[in-house]
């Protein structure tokens, strides 16, 4: 016989509104994690603040450590700046409702996702306490540098012997309709910064100068037109895009001494940050030799590509999505990076959340009925996971 609920269910829509009203523009905590800690503690979760480097993080676990299997949720409460507040039709931290829409910064990315999994987890442990543990790892550093957020939580977990066996990151994953996409991996991201150095001089005396501009144009052409691969079963082809070329030369009769170029690569599991850095260095050296310039290069790796192969976890989430939304989510690795790139070093991870095409925009908003659907999806995932 199923257990009769003894508590009123947590309203994920009201919780989303409460979180939106917290001004938590990264790296500010803004009261969002304080609010969640109070709510989760009241529901019997053991909460620990894992702050590092001025960043606030919250680790909440229900269940005895080491007792049975552990299901994890990961998300963030920090948000990007609002931009031109005068352009908003609703206050960005007002959580105002207009029809089936709630407006506010973080409405989509991703205070609604955090509210949905927190509400689902609380209701689940109150109504059907599992033989195991549920962990919520929530950071205030995803939209910023991401160095003291989920990484800090995972480092702390390793130090104290905490673990999760599988994890859902609640980022907005659906491009058009609630339930239409789940992320089972992400492309890697690498940025390269080039400084091309020539010899400054008068543009009328080209024999006395070394112009860095043709060199940077040649390098940019070689990098951006090179076919890195044709893609794989689960990944699109890797790409290399020029994002900036800067000279800072206001004079029309002076050959500049140097120019800078930045390129951004998004790569699949046929490559690594090291292999692509080696390729970039080789191309830069070739252009430098051909043009008589000196080319300096530095790189920043935001994350390696990763894949959680289709299997038990994606099947579990996919069936829950199908049951609650009527849609079978496409398994995808598209989009930018997320904190799943850190979680994947700890346990199998997939991402599933709301429709994301309004995130980071003026008048960011979320469909209220989608928040309710997402809570039900997460609740069904927990039910099926602990029943297995």
UniProtKB/Swiss-Prot annotation:
CDD domains, A to Z: M20_DapE_proteobac
Q: Which GO terms describe its biological process?
A: diaminopimelate biosynthetic process; L-arginine biosynthetic process; lysine biosynthetic process via diaminopimelate
List the EC numbers from the record.
Answer: 3.5.1.18
Quote the Gene3D superfamilies the UniProt record gives: Zn peptidases
Its top-level enzyme class, in one word, is hydrolase
Q: Which residues bind Zn(2+) 1?
A: 76, 109, 171
- At which positions is Zn(2+) 2 bound? 109, 143, 360
List, alphabetically, the Pfam families matched: M20_dimer, Peptidase_M20
The chemistry this enzyme catalyses reads:
N-succinyl-(2S,6S)-2,6-diaminopimelate + H2O = (2S,6S)-2,6-diaminopimelate + succinate
GO MF term list: acetylornithine deacetylase activity; cobalt ion binding; succinyl-diaminopimelate desuccinylase activity; zinc ion binding
Note the superkingdom of the native organism. Answer: Bacteria
Pathway, per UniProt? Amino-acid biosynthesis; L-lysine biosynthesis via DAP pathway; LL-2,6-diaminopimelate from (S)-tetrahydrodipicolinate (succinylase route): step 3/3
Q: How is the cofactor bound?
A: Binds 2 Zn(2+) or Co(2+) ions per subunit.
Keyword list, A-Z: Amino-acid biosynthesis, Cobalt, Diaminopimelate biosynthesis, Hydrolase, Lysine biosynthesis, Metal-binding, Zinc
Tell me the active site.
Answer: 78, 142
Entry-linked SUPFAM superfamilies: Bacterial exopeptidase dimerisation domain (SSF55031), Zn-dependent exopeptidases (SSF53187)
Q: Which cofactor does this sequence's record say it needs?
A: Zn(2+); Co(2+)
- Give a short account of what the protein does: Catalyzes the hydrolysis of N-succinyl-L,L-diaminopimelic acid (SDAP), forming succinate and LL-2,6-diaminopimelate (DAP), an intermediate involved in the bacterial biosynthesis of lysine and meso-diaminopimelic acid, an essential component of bacterial cell walls.
Q: How does it assemble?
A: Homodimer.
UniProt family annotation: Belongs to the peptidase M20A family. DapE subfamily.
User: Which named protein is this?
Assistant: Succinyl-diaminopimelate desuccinylase
- What organism is the protein native to? Jannaschia sp. (strain CCS1)
């Amino acid at each position: 016989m199923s257990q009769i609920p003894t508590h009123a269910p947590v309203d994920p829509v009201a919780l989303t509104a409460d979180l939106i009203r917290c001004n938590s523009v990264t790296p500010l905590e803004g009261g969002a994690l304080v609010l969640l800690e109070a709510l989760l503690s009241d529901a019997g979760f053991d909460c620990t603040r894992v702050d590092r480097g001025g960043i606030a993080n919250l680790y909440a676990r229900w269940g005895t450590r080491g007792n049975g299997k552990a299901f994890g949720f990961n998300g963030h409460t920090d948000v990007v700046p609002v931009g031109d507040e005068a352009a908003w039709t609703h206050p960005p931290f007002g959580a105002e409702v207009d029809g089936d829409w709630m407006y506010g910064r973080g409405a989509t990315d991703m205070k609604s996702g955090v509210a949905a999994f927190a509400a689902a987890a609380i209701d689940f442990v109150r109504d059907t306490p599992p033989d195991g543990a549920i962990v919520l790892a929530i950071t205030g550093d995803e939209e910023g540098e991401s160095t003291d957020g989920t990484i800090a939580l995972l480092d702390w977990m390793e130090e104290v012997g905490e673990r999760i066996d599988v994890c859902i990151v609640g980022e907005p994953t659906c491009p058009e309709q609630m339930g239409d996409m789940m992320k089972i991996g992400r492309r890697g991201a690498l940025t390269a910064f080039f400084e091309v150095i020539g010899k400054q001089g008068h543009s009328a005396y080209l024999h006395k100068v070394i112009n860095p501009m043709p060199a940077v144009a040649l390098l940019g052409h070689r990098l951006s037109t090179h076919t890195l691969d044709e893609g794989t079963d689960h990944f699109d082809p890797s790409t290399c895009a020029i994002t900036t070329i800067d000279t800072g030369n206001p004079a029309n009769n002076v050959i500049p001494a140097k120019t800078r170029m930045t390129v951004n690569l998004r790569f699949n599991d046929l490559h690594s940050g090291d292999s692509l850095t080696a390729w970039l260095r080789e191309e830069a050296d070739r252009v430098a030799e051909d043009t008589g310039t000196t080319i300096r290069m530095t790189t920043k790796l935001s994350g390696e590509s990763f894949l959680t192969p289709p299997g038990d976890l994606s099947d579990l989430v996919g069936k829950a999505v199908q049951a609650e939304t009527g849609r079978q989510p496409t398994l995808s690795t598209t989009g930018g990076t997320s904190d799943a790139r850190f979680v994947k070093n700890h346990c199998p991870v997939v991402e599933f959340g709301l429709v994301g095409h309004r995130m980071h925009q003026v008048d960011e908003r979320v469909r209220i009925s989608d928040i309710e659907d997402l809570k039900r999806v997460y609740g069904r995932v927990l039910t099926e996971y602990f029943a297995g």
